[in-house]
């Protein structure tokens, strides 16, 4: 009698969906108040002028203007520079 013992079940085979983190508005892009600029875990990029930060470290625009990424000392900073009205 040819029989085979039942194989054990694998404990692998799961994965979680990606969290959709990263830069949402590029350097020089126009934003309006409330636009999300960066989604991140921790403050990899710090908020600068006219930029707010949420409790999950999301960086968002407080005013209309152009996005500007800078590096000051060891920190990456994002600002929103207002465009002068004509």
UniProtKB/Swiss-Prot annotation:
It comes from the Bacteria. It holds the Pfam family Ribosomal_L27. PROSITE patterns: RIBOSOMAL_L27 (PS00831). One of its GO terms (molecular function) is structural constituent of ribosome. One of its GO terms (cellular component) is ribonucleoprotein complex. One of its GO terms (biological process) is translation. Keywords: Ribonucleoprotein, Ribosomal protein. HAMAP family: Ribosomal_bL27 (MF_00539). PANTHER family: LARGE RIBOSOMAL SUBUNIT PROTEIN BL27M (PTHR15893:SF0), RIBOSOMAL PROTEIN L27 (PTHR15893). Belongs to the bacterial ribosomal protein bL27 family. This is Large ribosomal subunit protein bL27. It comes from Rickettsia bellii (strain OSU 85-389).
């Amino acid at each position: 009698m040819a029989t085979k013992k039942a194989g054990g079940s694998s404990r692998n085979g799961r994965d979680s969906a990606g969290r959709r983190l990263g830069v949402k508005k590029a350097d020089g892009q126009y934003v309006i108040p409330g636009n999300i600029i960066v989604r991140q875990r921790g403050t990899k990029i710090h908020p600068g002028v006219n930029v707010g930060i949420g409790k999950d470290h999301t960086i968002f625009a407080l005013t209309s203007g152009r996005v500007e990424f800078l590096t000051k000392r060891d920190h990456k900073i994002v600002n929103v520079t207002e465009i002068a009205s004509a």
